[in-house]
Amino acid sequence: MKIQAAFLLISLVLLPALSSHADTVQTTANGIKYPIGLKNWRVISSSFRTDNNTQRVILGNSLAINASRSGKTNPWPNGAILAKLVWKNSQHPQWNKAIVPGEFVHSEIMIRDSSKYTSTGGWGFARWIGETQQPYGEKKSFAQECFACHKHAKDSHFVFTKPATIP
C-alpha cells in the first residue's frame, strides 16, 4: 500500500511537468492542433529564404520521415505531417562567417489528408506566430493564402521541401 501511495504522489508531482507544449498552444481557425511531440521529430531538410532573411528546419512525423527516406513523396502518404520551424538569420557572435538561428519567427504545419483538404491539394495548412505560438489567421480560409504559393509546387505534390540526402 505504501508503494502505491508513493507512486501516486510521485505521479501527481511529475504529471504537470510531462504535459506537452502542444497542450498549451491554441488550435488554428481551421481546426488544426499543434502536433504533440513535434520537438522529438526528425529532420527531413532545411532551407534558407533570401527574400526575408530566414532559415528553416523541416521536421516530419514518422510517416513523413519514412516517405522522405524511401523516395515516396509524390504523392506524400495520407497522415504525413511536415513541420517547418522558421528563424531570422543571425550572424554568429564569435564567427562572422557563420549564420545561425536568431529570433524565432513561426512554425508552419502541413498535414496530408487527401479527402479532408480537397480545396488545398490534399494538405491542411497551419501556422503559429512567435515563441508564444499564437495561431495565424482569424478565419478558416487563411489556408488559401498558404495554398496560393504551394500551388506553384504542383509537380512535387505542393511541397517545396526537397528531402536532404543523409548518407
What is each residue range found by the language model?
Residues 7-16:
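Bacterial N-terminal signal peptides
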Residues 54-67:
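Short, structured beta-strand/loop micro-motifs enriched in basic residues and often containing a Trp
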